[in-house]
């Protein structure tokens, strides 16, 4: 009986930490469903990179998505944040991304984006300068850290 009682708190702790979990596949589906729901425009949208992590320190994951806006002769990227406020993950905010995004990660609540930027002699097609941008999710906004 003692062994059973000792295991119960650990089991309950494991269950409580799983209640807020979202898998990578679920996050990618949420991102894909979101871009599919956007109204038709002169651009098309594509969720190109998706990461999951706690951005605000509340112990619950947020979903961060690199969304590509693809126009007829141009493209740009933005950072979309999805938050679960008890009714499933919903789009909560966006910020602009710079350059040709290579990777996105979350490190201690900060979104770290590695991009290629054009150097002084680079043709428009082929940026060569490595640049790292950092963003914080604060007050419902994506804020670029300087």
What residues fall within each predicted segment?
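Acidic, small-residue rich beta-repeat scaffolds with periodic aromatic anchors
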Residues: 4-5, 18-40, 102-146
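Bacterial N-terminal signal peptides
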Residues: 6-16
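A short beta-strand motif characteristic of beta-propeller blades
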Residues: 37-41, 90-93
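Beta-propeller blade termini
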Residues: 44-55, 99-112
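Hydrophobic/aromatic beta-strand elements that line small-molecule binding cavities or substrate pockets
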Residues: 49-51, 79-82, 101-103, 132-135
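Acidic/hydrophobic-patterned starts of short beta strands in beta-sheet-rich repeat architectures
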Residues: 57-68, 109-116
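Structural motif
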Residues: 72-80, 121-127
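Beta-propeller fold detector
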Residues: 91-98, 144-146
């Amino acid at each position: 009986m003692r062994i059973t009682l000792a295991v119960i708190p650990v089991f309950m702790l494991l269950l409580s930490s799983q209640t807020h979990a979202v898998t990578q596949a679920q996050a990618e589906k949420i991102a894909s469903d979101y871009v599919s729901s956007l109204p038709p425009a002169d651009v098309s949208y594509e969720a190109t990179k998706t990461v999951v992590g706690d951005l605000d320190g509340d112990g619950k994951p947020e979903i961060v998505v690199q969304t590509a806006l693809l126009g007829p002769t141009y493209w740009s990227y933005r950072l979309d944040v999805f938050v679960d406020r008890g009714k499933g993950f919903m789009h909560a905010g966006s910020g602009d991304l710079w350059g040709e995004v290579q990777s996105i990660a979350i490190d201690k609540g900060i979104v770290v984006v590695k991009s290629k930027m054009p150097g002084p002699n680079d043709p428009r097609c082929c940026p060569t300068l490595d640049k790292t941008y950092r963003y914080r999710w604060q007050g419902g906004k994506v804020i670029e850290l300087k």
